[in-house]
């Protein structure tokens, strides 16, 4: 557990993070968590490194790498940043190596980087295709019925299972750290359920529920 001792929010066009970095230096927290996004916010990571903060206070993020920031920043600016996602392109598994090999064989020099968001979309298509195959039809309600039967498929990110009550997924989660401009996978957490959503949402018991829940996540 832990306590958040301060929180800052920034417009998407902000490029000067000096005041916030100075506040962090004064507060000396155990860790800093960034959810910054967009081109302007890349300045934070550059200024963080320039202020000598790398190695002083760990920096984690729930967004870093999704926009391929680690491929844009220098190693000096990005090495050591920690992120946790359901997929990293650097996963060293047979399924992922096969997927990337086929992707590169098809697109060659035009092969795009594959991040968490891209893989989630790919997984969704694979799950839908498997549900259509099992249902024997593309009829919407028939496919939903199959999807709610805890259907699973195994792809580049690992095994992904639909959690019927939440319509979210049970999936492997990976903890990674940027090293040399790429993510190094430090830990693997198998078949993690959508526990936060499951605490408030059950679409099997309440199939017409359209509530937008405010989920509080304990630190």
Residue ranges and their predicted role:
Residues 1-219:
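Extracytosolic ligand-binding ectodomains
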């Amino acid at each position: 557990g832990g306590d958040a001792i301060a929180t800052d929010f920034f417009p998407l066009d902000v490029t000067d993070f000096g005041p916030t970095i100075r506040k962090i230096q004064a507060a000396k927290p155990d860790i800093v968590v960034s959810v910054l996004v967009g081109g302007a916010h890349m300045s934070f990571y550059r200024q963080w490194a320039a202020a000598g903060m790398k190695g002083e206070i760990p920096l984690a993020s729930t967004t870093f790498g999704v926009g391929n920031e680690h491929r844009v920043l220098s190693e000096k600016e990005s090495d050591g940043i920690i992120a946790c996602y359901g997929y990293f392109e650097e996963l060293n598994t047979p399924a992922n190596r096969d997927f990337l090999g086929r992707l590169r064989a098809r697109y060659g020099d035009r092969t795009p980087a594959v991040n968490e968001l891209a893989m989630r979309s790919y997984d969704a298509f694979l799950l839908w295709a498997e549900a259509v195959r099992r249902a024997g039809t593309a009829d919407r309600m028939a496919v939903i019925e199959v999807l709610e039967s805890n259907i699973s498929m195994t792809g580049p990110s690992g095994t992904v299972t639909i959690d019927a009550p939440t319509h979210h997924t049970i999936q492997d989660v990976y903890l990674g750290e940027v090293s040399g401009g790429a993510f190094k996978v430090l830990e693997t957490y198998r078949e993690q359920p959508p526990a936060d959503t499951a605490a408030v949402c059950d679409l099997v018991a309440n199939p017409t529920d359209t509530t937008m829940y405010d989920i509080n996540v304990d630190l």
